[in-house]
């Protein structure tokens, strides 16, 4: 009994903390470190601001298009009128009947966009990768090429190895 009482008195004097076992007087002198990093670099802050501004701009354009769509006609009735330009470059343009904006399918003619036959390949119009992932976008880039998969070697004849 006396041992337990002495032990309790000793514990009350020291007052250990429950997580790391340091005395309270040491913890009061030093501020605890945060469990995670709270510093954000200025470059990351600028990128976050640009991203928020871009999202806000997209939301505003969507709201404006909804307002205009409700006033004139439903969005399902919007049609694109296709017309060939008189240029010999072969670019095709689309004209939106409502907003009179022009979109070029071919984009600027570059050597990288030219196909093997000399005809330019169309550049894909893509506004937001989260909205519609495609085969050419949202690819995962690995640091190393995956290892070659080989069939296990067996001691049998080659004709027996590949029989299904």
Curated annotation (Swiss-Prot):
InterPro entries per record: CDRT4 (IPR029185)
One Pfam family hit: CDRT4
Protein's name in the database: CMT1A duplicated region transcript 4 protein homolog
Source organism (scientific name): Bos taurus (Bovine)
Start and end residues of each stretch annotated as Disordered: 65-94
